[in-house]
A protein has these predicted regions:
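ATP-dependent carboxylate activation and anion-phosphoryl transfer catalytic cores
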Residues: 1-201
Length: 201
C-alpha cells in the first residue's frame, strides 16, 4: 500500500478506534511531487467501486465481517478487471419512473434508490440527481473483455435507459498518455477507440 495512504490511515486510526467505527471508509489523496493532499473522507461504501466489489469479490461478506473485527481477509476476485458506467433514465423528475429489467442484466445493473414491485423496477421522483439512476457493471480477465461485455449489456438496456462508454474511453486516453511518459501498467490496455459502440445501438 502506498505510503501516502498509510500515513492518512495512521492519522485517522486513533479517532476511528475511539468511536469503535465499523463502517466503510474511503478517501481521496492527491499526490504532487513528494507531497500528499488528503480530501473527501467518505464514511460509506464508495460509488463507483461498490457495484464492482459486489460482483467481483467472491468472499466479500467474509472480508466485511472479519474486517469489522479487526481481522484482514484477502479478497478473492472472480476476474482480473471490472468496469462501471453510469446509467441514465429519461423521464419527468417530478414523477415516478418505471421499467422492467431484462433477466440478463439483473446481476449487473445496480439501481439504488429504487424498489421492486412485481416485475417492475420503480424509481421515486428525484430532483437532485437528474437522469442518473445507477451503475452498469462488467467483469473480465482483460480490459477488452470488460468493454465488449459492457457493449453487449448496453444493447440490452430497456427503452428509456442509456449508458455512455465515452468516460471509459477518456480514462483509456489518460492511461495511454501516462504510458507515453514512462508509467508502466501491468496489463495490456487497449486504445481509447475500443469503447466505440459497434453493435448498432
Amino acid at each position: 500500500m502506498p505510503q501516502q495512504i498509510q500515513d492518512v490511515l495512521d492519522a485517522f486510526s486513533p479517532v476511528l478506534k475511539e468511536y469503535r467505527y465499523r463502517n466503510f471508509w474511503s478517501m481521496e489523496i492527491r499526490v504532487k511531487d513528494d507531497a500528499a493532499y488528503f480530501g473527501d473522507a467518505t464514511t460509506r461504501a464508495p460509488m463507483p467501486a461498490t457495484p464492482s466489489n459486489l460482483e467481483n469479490i467472491k468472499n466479500l461478506p467474509e472480508v466485511i465481517y472479519h474486517g469489522a473485527q479487526g481481522q484482514l481477509v484477502q479478497p478473492y476476485y472472480e476476474k482480473k478487471f471490472t468496469g462501471e458506467v453510469l446509467v441514465n433514465m429519461k423521464g419527468d423528475r417530478h414523477a415516478w419512473g418505471v421499467t422492467e429489467v431484462p433477466e440478463e442484466l439483473k446481476r449487473w445493473l445496480k439501481l439504488p434508490n429504487s424498489c421492486q414491485i412485481d416485475s417492475l423496477r420503480c424509481f421515486p421522483p428525484d430532483e437532485q440527481h437528474g437522469e442518473a439512476i445507477g451503475w452498469l457493471v462488467a467483469i473480465g480477465d482483460t480490459v477488452e473483455e470488460v468493454i465488449a461485455t459492457m457493449k453487449d449489456q448496453i444493447a440490452l438496456l430497456p427503452d428509456g435507459m442509456s449508458a455512455d462508454l465515452e468516460p471509459l474511453g477518456e480514462l483509456l486516453t489518460v492511461v495511454e498518455q501516462a504510458q507515453e511518459k514512462g508509467i508502466d501498467f501491468p496489463a495490456e490496455v487497449p486504445p481509447p477507440e475500443t469503447v466505440l459502440v459497434d453493435n448498432g445501438t
